[in-house]
Structures are given as structure tokens and as C-alpha cells.
């Protein structure tokens, strides 16, 4: 029977002294006079299985030895036995090896430590390393844990358009898409591009958020969420930014900002706890090889009674009075930079922290204006090591206030009349949030660079797939 390493390592006694079949790849080969060894992995588990090949007992194994190369895919038949030196370690005594796909000395993933900078140049092969194997098994588990949480909370899973005419965030970092022939553009009489000739008959873009559409869904189905790709033409060349990433977006009818924060905290603790249970071996490897103290940090996260919550003004006062010589001097009315987020989460609070009631001038048009007329009912969740993980708000449900806010910011209602309809017909208090999926993975894995938690990362001047 075909056995996966995950099942074998989790319950080796079930397979002891039994003939089994394995399919996977060679991680390493070691040759001795009377026997040779293969470090074998099939991608389902962090640990390799040692394959023992006794040449004096099997002429076939001696013959195939010359064809064995690191990276080759193989099929193995043999018996699982205990290592004669270390009683609690199992290995496979091979009877037959079949090479399914050959490799060569040119294979770039050799059994040594490779820098992440080197591995980023070969994303199609780096997935075969232990660190990236761990990261992407955890990525899969987090996806499933998120869906499980919202299923149990009776949320409707939905999808929002990837192609749009709106800039939901108002940042302007949009990828424009077109079917027009850029070599032979059709111009109008006043020398402008004639978008009537384009596929949709108007300018269109890749979506930067599905929030606006989710609000329509929430006012129909009460509680909704989506988990999908987001695109931003952001030239920031930092360890936190890429052009394509995944976003968890949630909208809830009849929910205020407090309910928003409650669901954020409960969801995150549930996901982290689930990951600690289902990915113990991968997290142990990352703790020992990538981010010392990772497991302790995650256990402390789920052990917190509740995340601290402060107003923007209080957070800014903490920074101003800290006595720290920040590169970017904090002042009331400014946004937080990475160094400010690090101070608040890693020095002052030493924990995640909710920051609420931000100045309306630095937040989006759809956020509910507070009674003071100066701030909006929004929240950012900052966490150690990552910074901003979640951004959310109570949405403005009053039609006239929303229209006035759009006028203040010179936002045309031409493409947003449908959004205003949500306030015209059956408006209600509602709130929601967005969570950067890859930023959550950075926190969970201890891997610093967002490009290392996405299989095929895209950034400015960098696209190969």
C-alpha cells in the first residue's frame, strides 16, 4: 500500500515490519562500502525518512545506485524497521527502488543551508526545502482554520469581483486592465483614449478590496466573509509589501465597533490555537531553525485574557512621551510608522493592541464619524513582529453623512450610486474588517519577509510566472 510520511511518522507502530510503498523525492544520498542511505521526503511531513539500501543483498540496488541524484523522484518498496542503533527511530529497508523522474548535479537545492535571498530567485524549487515546506503546510492549515471558525459562527462564505471600476481604499494604487491594443490605441477627437472601445466600455482595474461589495452582501445575508486575492500597484520595496496578496474580509449587519473587535480577537485566538495543535512539528522546526521562542509567543497570544484597547490619541501620547528618538517624529494627526508600531507592541504593551478612534483625515470615507466630528469609529490591531495585522471600522450607515463625507474628499458618486443605495433602502448599523492573510502567516511562522510566505510573490519589476 502507498503510505504518506505524515501517517507513518504519526503512527509508526502501525507499519512496523510491514511492506510499504512510498513515492517522493531524494533529499540526500550517502554511500558506504556495503550499503547506502537515502534521505526521502514526500512533502507531507517535516522530517525525512532514512532509506537503507544493503547492496550485498540486492544486486538491483547496486545497479541503480549510479542513477540516484538529489532531487530525483522515486518509488520505494520495503519494510519499516527500527534503527538498530537508536531503538525509537524507524527507517525503511529498501527492497526495490524505481526512479520516476531523474535529476542531475545541476539541481540547485543541495543538502546545505541556502540563504533566503538565493531561494527567492528559484521560487519553483525552494518549496522543496524544509523551511518552505513548513511554511506552506501552515498556510494550508490556517486557511482551513479560518473557514472552520466562520462556518461555526454561521457566516456566509462568498466572493467579490476581482475586476472593478472603484478604488475602495482611496489610495490610488490600482492596476488598470484593458483589452485595447496598446500598440494601436484608438483616440478620441481630443486625443484621449477611447475607453468605449475597451471590453467593458470604461476604465477598469484589479480590485484592491471587496469590502464595498461585501457590505451589499451583509445587508442581505447578515454575516458574510471572503478570502481571496487582492492587487495593489504599490512600489514600496519592503518586507511587508507585494503586488498580489490574500485578504480575509468580513462584514456584519447590526454590529458595531465593539462587536467587530470581539470577533477579530476570538477568530485570531482560535486560528492560532488550531495551528498549534495541527502543525506541532512544523512549528517546532521553525522555532528551532528560524524564530527562537515562536511557540512560546503563540501560546502567550492565545493565553491573553483580552487584547489591550486604547484610543489613537492615547497611543500617540505614549509615543510622544516615550523619550525615544524615532526616525519619524510622532505627532497628533499623523499615521504610525513601523518603528511606532514596534514600540507600542514590543516595548510598551508587549502584546497585541487595538487602537481605535482615529482622525478622520487619515482614514477612509466609509467609516462612521464619531460624535466628536473629528474621529471615526475604526480600529487597527497591531501585533508584535508584524505591526498592523487587521484594519476595520463601523461603516457609516447615514446616507446624508456619507454623501457629505464623499464630497469632502472629492469622491465622485458616479460609480458608487449602488453603494449609496445600501443607505437609501434598509440601512442599518454594520461593521467589518480586513486581515492581511500573509501578515498573519508572518506572525505564525516567524518568517520576516512576506515574499517567503507566498509561493510565487509578485512585486514591482519582478514577475516571472
Curated annotation (Swiss-Prot):
The keyword Ligase applies. Pfam families: tRNA-synt_2, tRNA_anti-codon. It catalyses: tRNA(Asn) + L-asparagine + ATP = L-asparaginyl-tRNA(Asn) + AMP + diphosphate + H(+). One of its GO terms (biological process) is asparaginyl-tRNA aminoacylation. GO terms for cellular component: cytoplasm. Belongs to the class-II aminoacyl-tRNA synthetase family. It is found in: Cytoplasm. Transmembrane segments: none annotated. Its EC number is 6.1.1.22. It comes from Phytoplasma mali (strain AT). Coiled coil: none annotated. InterPro entries: Aa-tRNA-synt_II, aa-tRNA-synth_II, aa-tRNA-synth_II/BPL/LPL, Asn-tRNA-ligase, Asp/Asn-tRNA-synth_IIb, NA-bd_OB-fold, NA-bd_OB_tRNA. The keyword Aminoacyl-tRNA synthetase applies. This is Asparagine--tRNA ligase. Its main location: cytoplasm.
Amino acid at each position: 500500500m502507498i503510505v504518506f510520511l505524515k501517517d507513518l511518522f504519526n503512527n509508526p507502530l502501525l507499519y512496523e515490519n510491514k511492506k510499504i510503498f512510498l513515492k517522493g523525492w531524494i533529499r540526500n544520498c550517502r554511500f558506504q562500502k556495503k550499503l547506502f542511505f537515502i534521505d526521502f521526503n514526500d512533502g507531507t511531513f517535516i522530517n525525512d525518512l532514512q532509506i537503507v539500501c544493503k547492496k550485498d543483498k540486492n544486486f538491483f540496488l547496486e545497479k541503480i545506485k549510479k542513477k540516484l541524484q538529489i532531487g530525483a523522484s522515486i518509488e520505494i518498496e520495503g519494510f519499516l524497521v527500527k534503527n538498530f542503533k537508536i531503538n525509537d527511530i524507524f527507517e525503511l529497508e529498501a527492497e526495490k527502488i524505481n526512479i520516476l523522474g531523474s535529476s542531475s548535479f545541476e539541481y540547485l537545492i543541495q543538502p546545505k543551508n541556502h540563504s533566503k535571498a538565493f531561494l527567492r530567485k528559484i521560487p519553483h524549487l525552494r518549496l522543496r526545502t524544509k523551511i518552505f515546506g513548513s511554511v506552506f503546510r501552515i498556510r494550508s492549515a490556517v486557511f482551513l482554520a479560518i473557514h472552520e471558525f466562520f462556518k461555526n459562527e454561521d457566516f456566509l462564505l462568498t466572493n467579490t469581483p476581482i475586476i472593478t471600476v472603484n478604488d475602495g481604499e482611496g489610495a490610488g494604487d490600482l492596476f488598470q486592465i484593458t483589452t485595447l491594443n496598446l500598440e494601436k490605441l484608438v483616440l478620441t477627437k481630443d486625443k484621449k483614449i477611447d475607453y468605449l472601445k475597451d471590453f467593458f466600455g470604461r476604465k477598469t482595474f484589479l480590485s484592491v478590496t471587496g469590502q464595498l461589495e461585501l457590505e451589499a452582501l451583509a445587508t442581505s445575508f447578515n454575516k458574510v466573509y471572503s478570502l481571496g486575492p487582492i492587487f495593489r500597484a504599490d512600489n514600496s520595496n519592503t518586507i511587508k509589501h507585494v503586488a498580489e496578496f490574500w485578504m480575509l474580509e468580513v462584514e456584519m449587519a447590526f454590529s458595531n465597533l465593539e462587536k467587530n473587535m470581539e470577533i477579530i480577537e476570538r477568530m485570531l485566538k482560535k486560528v492560532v490555537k488550531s495551528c498549534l495543535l495541527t502543525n506541532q512539528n512544523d512549528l517546532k522546526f521553525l522555532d528551532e531553525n528560524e524564530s527562537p521562542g515562536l511557540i512560546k509567543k503563540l501560546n502567550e497570544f492565545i493565553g491573553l485574557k483580552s487584547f489591550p484597547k486604547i484610543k489613537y490619541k492615547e497611543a500617540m501620547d505614549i509615543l510622544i512621551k516615550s523619550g525615544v528618538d524615532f526616525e519619524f517624529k510622532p505627532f497628533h494627526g499623523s499615521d504610525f510608522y513601523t518603528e511606532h508600531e514596534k514600540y507600542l507592541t514590543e516595548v510598551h504593551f508587549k502584546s497585541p493592541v487595538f487602537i481605535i478612534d482615529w482622525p478622520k483625515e487619515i482614514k477612509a470615507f466609509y467609516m462612521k464619524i464619531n460624535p466628536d466630528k473629528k474621529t471615526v469609529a475604526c480600529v487597527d490591531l497591531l501585533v508584535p513582529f508584524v505591526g498592523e495585522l487587521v484594519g476595520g471600522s463601523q461603516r457609516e450607515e447615514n446616507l446624508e453623512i456619507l454623501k457629505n463625507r464623499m464630497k469632502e474628499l472629492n469622491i465622485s458618486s458616479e460609480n458608487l450610486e449602488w453603494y449609496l443605495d445600501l443607505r437609501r433602502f434598509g440601512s442599518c448599523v454594520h461593521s467589518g474588517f480586513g486581515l492581511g492573510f500573509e501578515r498573519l502567516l508572518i506572525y505564525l511562522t516567524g518568517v520576516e519577509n512576506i515574499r517567503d510566505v507566498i509561493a510565487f510573490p509578485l512585486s514591482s519589476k519582478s514577475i516571472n510566472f
